[in-house]
């Protein structure tokens, strides 16, 4: 009897499925764009059933061309993910398109192909992370995309979305549980369909993806990483910028293959005259002011490689990250390298004081708020630069509607300020309990440059091979809702207690807000008393 009932159940289920499929397929996930080049792009979507995968496209809404692709299973049901690659496109050209599966047809959308680096076209990108659902605020990801990104671009730049935004970077934690099939549609793709249907999206894995098969089925990323670890790490060029995606998750973050690959890519990038900037993205922070338990030591290896690359090549770099649910922006002391936490685009905020935190020297701004990061790349062939802007959506205590709460501009070319003049301790004898170092005002020939950091060193050796005192202070340090550097003009610094009856040497250098250091000042000398 049990066997008979099971047979009847299977038969009825099959009949229901066939009956459902006798109608038109339903688009579960609207078309989204991936892996764009000047001459090609990949378009994916998901339907309730159906094997036909067709994209109709053209340079006008009349379309006129067709490309066919593949369909494949996603969750052992009739649902199908469709993927079509169009390969006959012209560079830096706007196209219209729609997708078709059987009689089911999407709306018409638009996209724009990337330029060649030699076209010297400026562009914008968005970076944001940790949009996994907050069950106490389940619509936050939709708000960040639709009221945040899309409204910000509409207000600030006018025109069509594909003209104003080239790509979207997502450094992980796209969903709460990557092994839960339903979350991908409901919590991630559907809220962002107006964005992803017109702008290519480039994610990397976060811990919440759990290395899920669904992630690799939904996304088609550049296959230029290590073949055995396809789509775990990769790079993509857009104009004068190289974007590098990395995997900082357990089981992958310590793999020698990833670091060997990254070193080779950076070496090739240093030699590539077309590339001015490198933007890397990985999920886990090396340092986190809001949430120390979220730090990952191995991410420090990536930071060191990027720092070394930037200093040797003269090409500034950034690492975008998430995991900590808030915004932070910092900069390396000795390198033109930025640290930018681009969360949270949906996940519950890591509020000040909620977890163990620390005030790190590198970071000048940390905010426990939702939002996204806008990156504007100026491809001027003579003097390229990029600007990073934090666009905030606030938090439960402070409402913000696309308010810019932080920004920084980095030029590729050096524009060094003038070396500071030391004003104190020239062959003097002083008390060892603490010495006040003083230097002159900041000056620079660069328009708009101002004094943004000072670096002080004291040594008992003339070559500064060993340091008795060192201090690096920046012009602002927003930590726990206050600027801890308020009223510091950066022209003097008091040392710690020094050894008595000792000859010391000291020097200072200044930095502007664009990360350009002066050379070191002349060396001052002093002797401490008994």
Residue spans for each PLM region:
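Short acidic, glycine-rich surface-loop motifs adjacent to enzyme active sites
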Residues: 172, 269-294
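Extended active-site neighborhood of metal-dependent phosphoesterases/phosphodiesterases
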Residues: 94-113, 179-272, 297-312, 326-363, ...
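Conserved, compact domain cores that house catalytic/ligand-binding motifs in diverse enzymes
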Residues: 121-204, 441-443, 453-455
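Acidic/histidine-rich helix-loop elements
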Residues: 61-77, 127-151, 178, 217-226, ...
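Active-site-proximal beta-strand elements of phosphoester/diester hydrolases
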Residues: 121-135, 240-250, 279-283, 337-344
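Acidic, histidine-bearing metal-coordination/catalytic regions of metal-dependent phosphoesterases
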Residues: 20-139, 155-163, 275, 385-505, ...
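Bacterial Sec-dependent N-terminal signal peptides
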Residues: 1-22
């Amino acid at each position: 009897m049990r066997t008979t009932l099971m047979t009847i159940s299977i038969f009825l289920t099959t009949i229901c499925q066939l009956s459902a499929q006798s109608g038109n397929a339903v688009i579960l996930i609207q078309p989204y764009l991936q892996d764009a080049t000047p001459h090609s792009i990949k378009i994916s979507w998901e339907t309730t059933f159906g094997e036909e995968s067709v994209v109709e496209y053209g340079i006008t809404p009349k379309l006129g061309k067709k490309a066919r692709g593949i369909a494949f299973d996603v969750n052992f049901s009739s649902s199908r993910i469709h993927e079509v690659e169009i390969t006959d496109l012209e560079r830096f050209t706007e196209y219209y398109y729609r997708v078709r599966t059987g009689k089911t047809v999407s709306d018409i959308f638009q996209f724009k192909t990337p330029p060649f680096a030699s076209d010297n076209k400026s562009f914008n990108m968005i970076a944001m992370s940790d949009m996994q659902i907050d069950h106490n605020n389940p619509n936050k990801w939709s708000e960040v995309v639709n009221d945040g990104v899309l409204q910000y671009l509409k207000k600030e730049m006018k025109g069509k979305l594909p003209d104003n935004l080239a790509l979207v970077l997502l450094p992980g934690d796209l969903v709460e549980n990557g092994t839960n099939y339903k979350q991908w549609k409901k919590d991630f793709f559907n809220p962002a369909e107006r964005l992803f249907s017109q702008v290519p999206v480039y994610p990397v894995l976060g811990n919440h993806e759990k290395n899920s098969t669904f992630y690799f089925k939904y996304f088609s990323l550049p296959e230029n990483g290590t073949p055995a670890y396809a789509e775990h790490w990769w790079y993509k060029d857009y104009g004068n910028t190289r974007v590098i995606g990395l995997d900082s998750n357990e089981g992958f973050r310590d793999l020698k293959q990833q670091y060997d690959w990254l070193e080779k890519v950076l070496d090739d990038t240093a030699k590539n005259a077309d590339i001015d900037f490198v933007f890397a993205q990985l999920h886990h922070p090396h340092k986190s002011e809001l949430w120390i338990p979220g730090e990952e030591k191995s991410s420090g290896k990536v930071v060191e490689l990027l720092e070394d690359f930037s200093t040797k090549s003269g090409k500034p770099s950034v690492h975008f990250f998430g995991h900590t649910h808030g915004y932070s922006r910092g900069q390396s002391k000795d390198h033109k390298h930025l640290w930018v936490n681009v969360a949270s685009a949906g996940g519950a905020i890591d509020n000040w004081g909620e977890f163990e935190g620390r005030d790190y020297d590198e970071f000048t701004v940390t905010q426990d708020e939702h939002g996204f990061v806008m990156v504007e790349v100026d491809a001027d062939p003579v003097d390229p630069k990029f600007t990073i802007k934090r666009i905030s959506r606030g938090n439960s205590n402070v409402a913000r509607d696309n308010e810019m709460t932080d920004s920084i501009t980095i030029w590729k070319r050096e524009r060094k300020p003038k070396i500071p003049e030391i004003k104190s301790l020239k062959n003097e004898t002083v008390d060892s309990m603490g010495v006040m170092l003083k230097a002159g005002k900041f000056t620079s020939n660069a328009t708009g440059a101002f004094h943004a950091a000072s670096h002080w060193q004291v040594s008992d050796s003339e070559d500064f091979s060993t340091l008795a005192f060192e201090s690096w202070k920046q012009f602002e340090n927003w930590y726990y809702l206050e600027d801890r550097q308020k009223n510091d003009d950066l022209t003097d610094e008091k040392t710690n207690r020094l050894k008595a009856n000792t000859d010391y040497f000291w020097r200072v250098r200044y930095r502007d807000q664009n990360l350009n250091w002066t050379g070191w000042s002349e060396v001052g000398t002093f002797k401490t008393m008994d």
